[in-house]
């Protein structure tokens, strides 16, 4: 072995020459993203600036603790980066305190639980079946194992959040924590009403805005900052940053508890390269262009929902106020799993999703979830989403008529044509 080959940081040690297998897989994934329509509601396309920060030399730095209070030396520059991320996040959501270290939205929620609850305490969250998230008290999740989880649902006629049920369950069970948020709910959430209910029973209110955070930052969706005791979010999805989590609050005492819960409670060293990418994304979200983008995200979702309705598809709640569009396939007697597989073969990626009070298993489902954030980033406009709705309908009709292979091939050609007009990276 030569001296040069022993030095892993030499200038010739790029990914392609070092590990061609991983390099080729990444290149194939890039080609997939370029040639397919990404309609998964939790996905987006991060900017090159965000990805450059995430792939930076900050990967090498260990920095247990918080700015100015690290357990390692040599942290003066990563302190600068983390402070920038905190300052920008607080400005973005009009809050006083923030922790940008959680590795994910799930860990951000776990930090809240660790700071406010003890095992056996009662929590109240939206049922997974009705659009909630695993960390909101679902049985398979630790939040459903460590705590007494009470689940609220949606109205069986409108599929809107049943706030009267939320209040009834809160008064009956006296939860210590109420969670307002969702992973598959397309409409506005009444955070003010949630806080009123929390006040009646002396509960903390957690607003999990993982899906809506970018829209909230841009003023396109109601903000919980005035009402929630604590706010958690991911930093990708509509916020268009790296994959990660954050926790925010206006209460200094709660902030101190959260700080201790994140470190040393749940995590050791923060991912400083990811925090740098978060800081970049927050700066991008503070720009006027981000407001224009977010407005288009919602407009495009409304067009997609209306166009799918025009094809006779049942849209949960009848429309959307966000980036999310939920389709109920029960009238077509189709399963979500079959439809998403056919769509993927045609170059359209989305996810199967349970619809309210679904009797199918989560691995099968009776519905589809679409999101418009990624393809709006790509540059698609209303007319393009109307065309996408037509293509989705063609796939569904192909399944009904039994000629899916031919339809998938034709749709795939159209998808590739759309993608070629809107190149990425």
Swiss-Prot record:
<feature type="binding site">
    <location>
        <begin position="132"/>
        <end position="134"/>
    </location>
    <ligand>
        <name>(6S)-5,6,7,8-tetrahydrofolate</name>
    </ligand>
</feature>
<dbReference type="GO" id="GO:0035999">
    <property type="term" value="P:tetrahydrofolate interconversion"/>
</dbReference>
<comment type="pathway">
    <text>Amino-acid biosynthesis; glycine biosynthesis; glycine from L-serine: step 1/1.</text>
</comment>
<feature type="binding site">
    <location>
        <position position="128"/>
    </location>
    <ligand>
        <name>(6S)-5,6,7,8-tetrahydrofolate</name>
    </ligand>
</feature>
<dbReference type="InterPro" id="IPR049943">
    <property type="entry name" value="Ser_HO-MeTrfase-like"/>
</dbReference>
<comment type="function">
    <text>Catalyzes the reversible interconversion of serine and glycine with tetrahydrofolate (THF) serving as the one-carbon carrier. This reaction serves as the major source of one-carbon groups required for the biosynthesis of purines, thymidylate, methionine, and other important biomolecules. Also exhibits THF-independent aldolase activity toward beta-hydroxyamino acids, producing glycine and aldehydes, via a retro-aldol mechanism.</text>
</comment>
<dbReference type="GO" id="GO:0005829">
    <property type="term" value="C:cytosol"/>
</dbReference>
<comment type="similarity">
    <text>Belongs to the SHMT family.</text>
</comment>
<feature type="modified residue" description="N6-(pyridoxal phosphate)lysine">
    <location>
        <position position="237"/>
    </location>
</feature>
<dbReference type="InterPro" id="IPR015421">
    <property type="entry name" value="PyrdxlP-dep_Trfase_major"/>
</dbReference>
<keyword id="KW-0554">One-carbon metabolism</keyword>
<comment type="subunit">
    <text>Homodimer.</text>
</comment>
<dbReference type="InterPro" id="IPR015422">
    <property type="entry name" value="PyrdxlP-dep_Trfase_small"/>
</dbReference>
<dbReference type="Pfam" id="PF00464">
    <property type="entry name" value="SHMT"/>
</dbReference>
<keyword id="KW-0028">Amino-acid biosynthesis</keyword>
<protein>
    <recommendedName>
        <fullName>Serine hydroxymethyltransferase</fullName>
        <ecNumber>2.1.2.1</ecNumber>
    </recommendedName>
</protein>
<dbReference type="InterPro" id="IPR015424">
    <property type="entry name" value="PyrdxlP-dep_Trfase"/>
</dbReference>
<dbReference type="GO" id="GO:0019264">
    <property type="term" value="P:glycine biosynthetic process from serine"/>
</dbReference>
<keyword id="KW-0663">Pyridoxal phosphate</keyword>
<dbReference type="InterPro" id="IPR001085">
    <property type="entry name" value="Ser_HO-MeTrfase"/>
</dbReference>
<keyword id="KW-0963">Cytoplasm</keyword>
<feature type="site" description="Plays an important role in substrate specificity">
    <location>
        <position position="236"/>
    </location>
</feature>
<dbReference type="InterPro" id="IPR039429">
    <property type="entry name" value="SHMT-like_dom"/>
</dbReference>
<comment type="pathway">
    <text>One-carbon metabolism; tetrahydrofolate interconversion.</text>
</comment>
<dbReference type="GO" id="GO:0004372">
    <property type="term" value="F:glycine hydroxymethyltransferase activity"/>
</dbReference>
<keyword id="KW-0808">Transferase</keyword>
<dbReference type="InterPro" id="IPR019798">
    <property type="entry name" value="Ser_HO-MeTrfase_PLP_BS"/>
</dbReference>
<dbReference type="GO" id="GO:0030170">
    <property type="term" value="F:pyridoxal phosphate binding"/>
</dbReference>
């Amino acid at each position: 072995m030569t001296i040069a080959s022993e030095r892993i940081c030499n200038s010739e040690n790029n990914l392609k020459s070092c590990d061609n297998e991983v390099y080729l897989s990444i290149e194939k994934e890039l080609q997939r993203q370029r040639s397919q329509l990404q309609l998964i509601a939790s996905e987006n396309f991060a900017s090159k600036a965000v990805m450059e920060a995430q792939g930076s030399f900050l990967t090498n730095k260990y920095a247990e603790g918080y700015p100015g209070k690290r357990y390692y030396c040599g942290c003066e520059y990563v302190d600068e980066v983390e402070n920038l991320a905190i300052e920008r996040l607080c400005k973005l959501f009009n809050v006083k305190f923030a922790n940008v270290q959680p590795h994910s939205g799930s860990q951000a929620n776990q930090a809240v639980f660790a700071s406010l609850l003890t095992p056996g305490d009662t929590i109240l969250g939206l049922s997974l079946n009705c659009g909630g998230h695993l960390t909101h008290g679902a049985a398979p999740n630790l939040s459903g194992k460590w705590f007494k989880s009470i689940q609220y649902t949606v109205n069986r006629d409108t599929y809107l959040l049943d706030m009267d049920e939320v209040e009834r369950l809160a008064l009956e069970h006296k939860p210590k924590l109420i969670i307002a948020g969702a992973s598959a709910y397309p409409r506005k959430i009444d955070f003010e009403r949630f806080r009123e209910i929390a006040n009646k029973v002396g509960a903390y209110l957690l607003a999990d805005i993982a899906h809506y955070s970018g829209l909230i930052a841009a003023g396109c969706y109601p903000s919980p900052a005035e009402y929630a005791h604590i706010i958690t979010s991911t930093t990708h999805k509509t916020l268009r940053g790296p994959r990660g989590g954050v926790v925010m609050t206006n209460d200094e005492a709660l902030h101190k508890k959260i700080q201790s819960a994140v470190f040393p409670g749940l995590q050791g060293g923060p991912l400083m390269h990811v925090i740098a990418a978060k800081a970049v994304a927050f700066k991008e979200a503070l720009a006027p262009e981000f407001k224009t983008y977010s407005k288009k995200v919602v407009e495009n979702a409304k067009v997609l929902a209306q166009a799918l309705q025009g094809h006779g598809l049942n849209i949960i709640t009848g429309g959307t106020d966000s980036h999310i569009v939920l389709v109920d396939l029960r009238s077509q007697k189709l399963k979500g799993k079959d439809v998403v597989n056919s769509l993927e073969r045609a170059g359209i990626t989305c996810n199967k999703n349970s619809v309210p009070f679904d009797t199918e298993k989560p691995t099968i489902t009776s519905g589809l979830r679409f999101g418009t954030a990624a393809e709006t980033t790509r540059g698609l406009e209303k007319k393009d989403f109307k065309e996408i709705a037509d293509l989705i309908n063609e796939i569904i009709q192909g399944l009904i008529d039994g000629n899916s292979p031919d339809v998938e091939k034709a749709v795939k050609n159209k998808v590739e044509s759309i993608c070629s007009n809107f190149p990425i990276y």
